[in-house]
Amino acid sequence: MENYFVNSEKKHLIQSSISSYESIHKTIGAVPTVIEQSGRGERAFDIYSRLLRERIIFLGSGINDQVSDSLVAQLLFLEAEDPEKDIQIYINSPGGSVTAGMAIYDTMQQISPDVVTICFGVAASMGAFLLSGGAKGKRLALPNSRIMIHQPLGGAQGQAVEIEIQAKEILFLKKTLNSLLAEHTGQPLEKINEDTERDYFLSPSEAVEYGLIDKVIKK
């Protein structure tokens, strides 16, 4: 049954991943194109699709459902291609939807390959959470990147009962995220709770000491 899934879904997953990538990055700006020569002539790839073939995924925007669906599809496809070889995720994200981010996080934890997380630019909020969720020993950051953690943000309007429901959900998400951060960093939950009350910025070296990452990339 597993082989059938891989064979029947592989083509759909890669087409879905590439289409989502193209859609997302077209909204950001012009995407460089790579021309490859083959026995059948030239073939053009956008740079992100080409890097996907090298098991490199980019999270270079805010996190929403579309971004989440694209990353999950790519992770599943790369696992189907090779369940043993590492997958790299480069993160430059201000964060975004907690539920969309948790979909990416859960997939990272469930697939067989180790997921290498690399911060370039900034990994803030849910971006920092995903950075910390990479495989132990394989969570990295470039020297001048910035990392920020804080509690979930949210707003509610409507009747008092509806506001109360939303407030309970935000508190639940806060408890869940902080517990997982404590697990990934090795910090006491009380310290995580205190530090995330406000925006808490760290340099890469500080993030290593905190346990959010394992190493700063240097030449």
Swiss-Prot record:
Keywords from the named record: Cytoplasm, Hydrolase, Protease, Serine protease
Reactions this protein catalyses: Hydrolysis of proteins to small peptides in the presence of ATP and magnesium. alpha-casein is the usual test substrate. In the absence of ATP, only oligopeptides shorter than five residues are hydrolyzed (such as succinyl-Leu-Tyr-|-NHMec, and Leu-Tyr-Leu-|-Tyr-Trp, in which cleavage of the -Tyr-|-Leu- and -Tyr-|-Trp bonds also occurs)
Active site (record annotation): S125, H150
GO BP terms: protein quality control for misfolded or incompletely synthesized proteins
Annotated compartments: Cytoplasm
HAMAP family on file: ClpP
Description of how the protein assembles with itself and partners: Fourteen ClpP subunits assemble into 2 heptameric rings which stack back to back to give a disk-like structure with a central cavity, resembling the structure of eukaryotic proteasomes.
Protein's UniProt name: ATP-dependent Clp protease proteolytic subunit 4
Naturally occurring in which organism (per UniProt): Prochlorococcus marinus (strain MIT 9312)
Lineage: Bacteria, Bacillati, Cyanobacteriota, Cyanophyceae, Synechococcales
